[in-house]
Amino acid sequence: MRLFLMFNMLFNWFPQAEPLIVTVNQEQIEWQSVCGTSSTKTYMDYRMITNRDSQQYKYIQSRMEARNGLLYDTDGSIGVALGSWWGKIGSKWTVELSSGEVYDLVKIDEKADKHTINGCQHIGDGSVIEFVIDTQTVPNSWWGGNGLVWNGNFNNYHKFKGNIQRIGKKKTVEVELDVSEFFPNHIQYK
């Protein structure tokens, strides 16, 4: 027996408890200065994006789903048009309104720089956020007396009412976690 133990110790064949490390993706929010605080929130139908070669069109077709008039990404973010200040198509943001409502948004269309102030706020109507919607699935109660959804401004709907209070850029980072304590019988062989 003594020879067997010495042989195993020499060649390190005994099972050894090692940390069990897993890598997971974790979403983080980097809070930033607000480029515009407008309460105006306009909309456009996603069918207005017709260039099949554009990033916008491809993103919408591959990742967005229409539910009750809004377009949702696979993670639940609401599809919107934003200016160039907000980054590329697919950029994800968390927006908090002065009402306390918080929304996760994804940029699926871009407002032209010539129509915005510093790539942020629309020159004509002052909107920062423009919802990209599916007018064919909009609930009847959303149609205003003027024939527009929420009379042309999502701020007229209590859930989207308020000025932009703060914004956060969403990003995904890889994090390593030691999960050994959850698997006490885990043994790795060297």
PLM-predicted stretches and their roles:
Residues 1-16:
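Sec-dependent N-terminal signal peptides of Gram-positive bacterial secreted proteins and lipoproteins
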Residues 13-190:
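Solvent-exposed, well-ordered loop and adjacent helix/strand elements within mature globular domains
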